[in-house]
Amino acid sequence: DSHPAALPNWGVGSADLIYEMPIQADGSTRELALFMGDYPDGAGPVRSARVPMCSLREMWGGVFAFYGYQGGRDKNNMKSWVEANSSVKKLKYPYLNGISKHADWFPRTSDGGHVGPHNVRLDLSAVYADYSETPKPHPFTFTETGLERGEDVNGVVINYKTTADAYMTAYEYNPATGLFERYRNGYAYTDGNTGETCAYANVIVLRTDISWASGNPSRPVIRLNGQGVAEIFQNGKYIRGSWARDCSETKNLNNRMVFFDENGEELPMKVGKTFIQIVDNEQPVVVVADEAVSGSIEPQKQRSTVGTGKKKK
């Protein structure tokens, strides 16, 4: 749940990879977090899932936990999508709906001042203890060093909701740690369990086509197959590369997504945590040099990137 009232999120500091994507045509977003080894007792707040998240679940495997899901009477609803395209074929475990027999794992809490509907907390340690399968991993390739070339930058700003700063995400590079510290709406993005600021070795802006099913502004259609532009940030460096996933919208969905550098070679992720910001091809993204991202940014120190140009391997 990335609504401003859902902050601070619980357990996000334990996630190995997080995606943020638009779920409303007005720019409201939601996040999908992947936990691959550290399973906190409390994670969330948990909200309803959207169809594009199912495609990512098929790519990674494992349990997909949510609290309600995208409905509708046509094929662009989550139940129909899972029955037609998922390896599971039914919207049941490991699709884990908190409005179900597993509701005990999704208690509501007022921790951190959260109120409904932004107060559903998931016990990930209980889910992990119950899950007996070992999903086939689809990892990135990794390097200890990360990028040593590219444009020197201090950070990046993505404002999904242009009418307000309620969904503004920013990253500021910390040379002492070699990580990009995350901010939401001008404040440090912290883990509600620990109070620590979340920081990432890899920040990727994934550009793709985004539309709305049957013109409904609450039902996103996000292309996560084929290829597109990727703006990649590591070690205080920025390059414009690409992404590719060899699958159709309904077939071979377990194929992994690969990121390439500006020369079309697969780009290893730097060892550490990764955040992927999914944006529309025409979404402006501000790349910042020299000035502090969390403070005022002089116009001459920033520039906006945009565009749909695609790179091929």
What would you call each of these model-derived segments?
Residues 1-19, 24-312:
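A surface/extracellular/periplasmic glyco- and lipid-processing/surface-interacting theme
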